[in-house]
């Protein structure tokens, strides 16, 4: 007798459920997406014990006809595609026909549905077996309840996380669906307590305000671009509003939330040097394209996609963000603490996106050089950098008006840190409607960020504090400038242009530099030897797993040759390519940091004025190459409020 046998449908569904239904969040995602595909305009999600005990989804969509109810729970049964041509033109969120049978096979499921023009259908399924089917009175739409999830797969149940974590995973999914479909009203409840309510009026900014808070919504920059193949719309935060995780960036493709590392990287590249190292923006990007250009049939969870014109899309995203930021003055405001507590606390802060971190491809970042230790080497000697100042013989004394106790100046728009879960509110429909109307009104009152150019306004110096911070003023208020960061930006743009113009000339090393590698690393570097020659780095094999370098490009900064060579090797080993543009930029950053004035260095008024004027000539006078802010602003109104001149 043969050993190979065909598995029965129930066992096949259990196996399929392992990929489709990983946790309660997977069930919520699949069922809510089905509701959206059914043209629902209102969806309610009710949870008990983070969905492990009960998940109930109620919608007002098209419903399911009686004759389709049983078929819907068979494997690969779907109304969304008919043939292989449809598979490459998918516009719906679901299409595989795996979700419902997979969910039903590992839970106790109850379905009440009606198309509105016939009696409804009541269906009960337990562990994949149909227990009951009957006609029932029902409004148009679908009401589906999933209870005792994983009751028949105890091994899966054992690996569920805490209630807090599983609820965080669900809210993460619901938030992203809400952003993807602002035209759908979503209500999320946990143990009969409301967590989220969106109006469904199509305003993405209002959804973002519901999730992240009205304060974050006020710091959103609208993004819009179009090419022959792609249309991009969305919002990203100003560089002053960041998080410690990239999971606060959401990418939507044809209405589907996807996890795509290269899209997130493109958003980061759009900020370029505006972000501090290790900080990420809050962003929402909706991308529309011909379904033929994207493959969504990569994984049963449908979170991963592949693009056929990926490089064109990435370039469009980067250029769109860079263009938007060039139109804005990126000076963060230094706020004043007031007695009034902000009403709108971010729902997102309750259940942080960290609970649902996406698994990213193992493509490590090449870390940009951090700010160098101020006690390291002396500044490099260059012919035409920004002026390098020496402390004046007569130490400049700050005006008496500035000699006072050091105050704690904190920008009001500093990165919003993650906060613990706050108490959930019991659901009250009247209170809910009032809160939603109040939020709508606040979003309508948000002033659009002025797109009137990013030129730094004229600044008039009035003093210096601790030999580190410059005070300046104009008709808009008081400015505080970090003198090291300011000159670092000036020098960076000088060195960046200088390094970028250098021809492919090489310089001999006095002592050859030896590079020892593992066998895998050696093979990868050997594969890229010709590419390395094109950028002026010549390697000679030395032994079985080593190379020696006898010469290097002339643009390598003096004293940093071996460090740049190591960076190039790291690129080749990890990225399997040589990015000369990135290497030159890193060299410019290192050179600019070393050549800049340091803290605790007093300047004359003339030197301060010259520094500010030179800063105004840079293309980005707002952040240093490492993304730290160069200056912060106190408006005249804020100062008057501090001193109780206005109330």
UniProtKB/Swiss-Prot annotation:
Disulfide bonds: none
Annotated signal sequence range: none
Record's keyword annotation contains DNA repair: yes
GO function terms (MF aspect): ATP binding; ATP hydrolysis activity; ATP-dependent DNA damage sensor activity; mismatched DNA binding
GO CC list: mismatch repair complex
Gene3D superfamilies: 3.30.230.10, Histidine kinase-like ATPase, C-terminal domain (3.30.565.10), MutL, C-terminal domain, dimerisation subdomain (3.30.1540.20), MutL, C-terminal domain, regulatory subdomain (3.30.1370.100)
KW Nucleotidyltransferase (keyword) present: no
GO BP: mismatch repair
Entry-linked CDD domains: HATPase_MutL-MLH-PMS-like (cd16926), MutL_Trans (cd00782)
SUPFAM superfamilies membership: ATPase domain of HSP90 chaperone/DNA topoisomerase II/histidine kinase, DNA mismatch repair protein MutL, Ribosomal protein S5 domain 2-like
Keywords: DNA damage, DNA repair
Family matches, as Pfam families: DNA_mis_repair (PF01119), HATPase_c_3 (PF13589), MutL_C (PF08676)
Known role: This protein is involved in the repair of mismatches in DNA. It is required for dam-dependent methyl-directed DNA mismatch repair. May act as a 'molecular matchmaker', a protein that promotes the formation of a stable complex between two or more DNA-binding proteins in an ATP-dependent manner without itself being part of a final effector complex.
PANTHER family attached to this UniProt entry: DNA MISMATCH REPAIR PROTEIN MLH, PMS, MUTL (PTHR10073), DNA MISMATCH REPAIR PROTEIN MLH1 (PTHR10073:SF12)
Family: Belongs to the DNA mismatch repair MutL/HexB family.
NCBIfam families according to UniProt: mutl, PRK00095.1-3
Listed name of the protein: DNA mismatch repair protein MutL
Gene that specifies this protein: mutL
């Amino acid at each position: 007798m043969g050993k190979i046998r065909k598995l029965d449908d129930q066992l096949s569904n259990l196996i399929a459920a392992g990929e489709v239904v990983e946790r309660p969040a997977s069930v919520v995602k699949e069922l809510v997406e089905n509701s959206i595909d059914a043209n629902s305009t209102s969806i309610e999600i009710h949870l008990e014990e983070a969905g492990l005990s009960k998940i109930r989804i109620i919608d007002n969509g098209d419903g399911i006809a009686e004759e389709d109810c049983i078929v819907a729970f068979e494997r690969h049964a779907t109304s969304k595609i008919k043939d292989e041509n449809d598979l490459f033109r998918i516009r719906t969120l679901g299409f595989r026909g795996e979700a419902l049978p997979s969910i039903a096979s590992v839970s106790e499921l109850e379905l009440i549905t009606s198309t509105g023009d016939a009696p409804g259908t009541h269906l009960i399924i337990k562990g994949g077996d149909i227990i009951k089917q009957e006609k029932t009175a029902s409004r148009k739409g679908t009401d589906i309840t999933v209870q005792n999830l994983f009751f028949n797969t105890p091994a899966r149940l054992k690996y569920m996380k805490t209630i807090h974590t599983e609820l965080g995973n669900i809210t993460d999914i619901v938030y992203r669906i809400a952003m993807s479909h602002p035209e759908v009203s979503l209500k999320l409840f946990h143990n009969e307590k409301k967590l989220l309510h969106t109006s469904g009026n199509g305003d993405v900014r209002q959804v973002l305000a519901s999730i992240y808070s009205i304060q974050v919504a006020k710091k959103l920059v609208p993004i819009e671009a179009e090419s022959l193949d792609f249309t991009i719309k969305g919002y990203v935060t100003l560089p002053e509003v960041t998080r410690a995780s990239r999971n606060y960036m959401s990418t939507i493709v044809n209405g589907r939330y996807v996890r795509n590392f290269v899209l997130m990287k493109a958003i980061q590249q759009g900020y370029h040097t505006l972000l501090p190292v290790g900080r990420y923006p809050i962003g929402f990007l909706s991308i529309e394209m011909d379904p033929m250009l994207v493959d969504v049939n990569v994984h049963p969870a449908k979170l991963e996609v592949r693009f056929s014109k990926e490089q064109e899309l990435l370039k469009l995203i980067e250029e769109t963000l860079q263009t938007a930021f060039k139109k804005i003055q990126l000076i963060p405001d230094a706020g004043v603490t007031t007695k009034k507590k902000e009403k709108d606390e971010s729902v997102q802060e309750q259940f942080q996106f960290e609970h649902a971190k996406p698994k990213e491809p193992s493509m490590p970042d090449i870390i940009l050089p951090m700010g160098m230790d101020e006690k390291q080497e002396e500044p490099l000697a260059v012919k035409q950098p920004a002026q390098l100042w020496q402390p004046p013989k007569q130490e400049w004394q700050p005006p008496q008006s500035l000699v006072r106790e050091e105050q704690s100046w904190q920008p009001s728009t500093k990165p919003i840190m993650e906060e613990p879960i706050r108490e959930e509110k019991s659901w009250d429909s009247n209170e809910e409607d009032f809160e939603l109307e109040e939020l709508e009104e606040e979003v309508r009152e948000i002033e659009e960020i002025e797109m009137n150019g990013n030129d730094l306004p004229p600044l008039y110096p009035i003093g210096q504090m601790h030999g580190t911070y410059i005070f300046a003023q104009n008709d808009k208020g008081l400015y505080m400038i970090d003198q090291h960061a300011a000159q670092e930006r000036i020098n960076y743009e000088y060195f960046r242009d200088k390094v970028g113009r250098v021809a492919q000339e090489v310089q001999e090393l006095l002592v050859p530099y030896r590079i020892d590698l593992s066998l895998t690393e050696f093979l990868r570097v050997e594969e890229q030897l010709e590419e390395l020659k094109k950028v002026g780095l010549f390697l000679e094999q030395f032994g079985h797993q080593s190379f020696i370098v006898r010469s290097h490009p002339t643009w390598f900064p003096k004293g940093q040759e071996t460090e740049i060579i190591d960076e190039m090797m790291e690129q080749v080993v990890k990225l399997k390519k040589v990015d000369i543009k990135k290497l030159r930029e890193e060299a410019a950053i290192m050179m600019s940091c070393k050549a800049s004035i340091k803290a605790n260095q007093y300047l004359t008024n003339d030197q301060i004025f010259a520094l500010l004027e030179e800063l105004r000539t840079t293309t980005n006078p707002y952040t240093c190459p490492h993304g730290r802010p160069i200056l912060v602003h106190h408006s005249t109104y804020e100062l008057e409020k501090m001193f109780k001149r206005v109330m």
